[in-house]
Amino acid sequence: MTKKITVLVCGGGNGAHVTAGLAASRDDIETRVLTTFADEAERWTNIMKENDLRITVDEGDIKSGESVDFKVKLNCITKDPSKAVPGADVIIFTVPAFAHQSYLEAIEPYIQPNTTIVGMPGQPGFEFQVFDVLKDKAKQCVIMSFESLPWACRIAEFGKFVQILMVKVNLMGCLIRGQSKPSYDPMEAVQRVMGKAPILTQANNYIEPILATKSIIHPPIMYGKWKDWDGKPIEEKPLFYQGLDEEQARYLGGISDELVATAKAIAAQKPEVDLSGVLHLYDWYLRDHKPYIKDTTSLLTVLQTDTAYDGLVHPMKETEDGKFVPDFRYRYLTEDVPNGLVVTKGLAQIAGVPTPYHDEVIAWCQKQLGKEIIVGDELKGKDIGSTRCPQRYGINTMDALVNIM
């Protein structure tokens, strides 16, 4: 018989609704929710007095293909970490990367040895941040980070109804055990929350998913599209992926080349670090998006003809006269630069790999964000503290990178 575990879900958004709902539907899981945003916990608690949380899975049960529709009751929703954290075996972060710091600081006083802390998604630099906030306590915990949310999902009615629109087949994560000795299998515990799908797979180490991250895709496309923009509003929203041109593809491919070079450099200096899972973006698309791609000639044609991206446009703001200007404060830059591109640049800097494409794109992005992160080709700007690059946490050598494992 599997050991009963207590799962704490951090957050109150789409991912939190689904994660808490799935966990609460399992007989051998006690489920709690911690949401520190405004009065969200109080609102949700009051809703639960009169209602259940309904979850629908549009894709249906993986085996039967029938749609699934079920209801659960959440008995513990709070904004008080002293009530939520003690006794929790697994703590799952479903909030965006910018909120990780505040949640880590909230749970830190109450965290116990052998707890599993899960970033879902963690995003690049999650591990550095956990060790920075939890200090020695982190060494007694299991740290896990997954590459994305397991589903496409949306809240239909806050606290009452959430829809799972798509379930991923596989989801890769990494695991740092440290000195922890949990009485349960951490990967099995998270799989228990998920159910049959997605199937969770484990990366070779925590560095591999950082260099294989997909959060490097948006900034170079934004840069290639808008670097020479004249500031005048345009008539319609341009397609993001399918509107790719050769210039944007050159920057995207160049950044991917630099990641592959960084993986090779780290593996050459530390042969025990297996980074064989770091693929060029072109090869990754051919592997993971193949059914959707009509023309596999190049990275440019792959994105232009990827039907999974049908209709996806650049983040834009509408002007008073119904035209459009680019939104440079959208998550494509606000999230994917400090918690993506800057982290991969940081690894390359430690490995001694030149990154002209990273440097050029980051230099433009930081202007749009009003930050100074990169100076020349080095991460030493005054706003380095707003990123999750290893240098921010005093990690500047290959030994320091590897010692975290």
From Swiss-Prot:
One GO MF term: oxidoreductase activity
Keywords of this entry: NAD, Oxidoreductase
SUPFAM superfamilies documented for this protein: 6-phosphogluconate dehydrogenase C-terminal domain-like, NAD(P)-binding Rossmann-fold domains
Gene3D superfamilies: N-(1-d-carboxylethyl)-l-norvaline Dehydrogenase, domain 2, NAD(P)-binding Rossmann-like Domain
Alphabetized InterPro entries for the sequence: 6-PGluconate_DH-like_C_sf, 6PGD_dom2, NAD(P)-bd_dom_sf, Opine/Lysopine_DH, Opine_DH
The UniProt record lists the keyword Chaperone: no
Documented EC number(s): 1.5.1.-
Pfam families noted in UniProt: Octopine_DH
Family membership: Belongs to the lysopine/nopaline/octopine/opine/vitopine dehydrogenases family.
Descriptive protein name: Opine dehydrogenase
Taxonomic lineage: Eukaryota, Metazoa, Spiralia, Lophotrochozoa, Mollusca
This protein's encoding gene: tadh
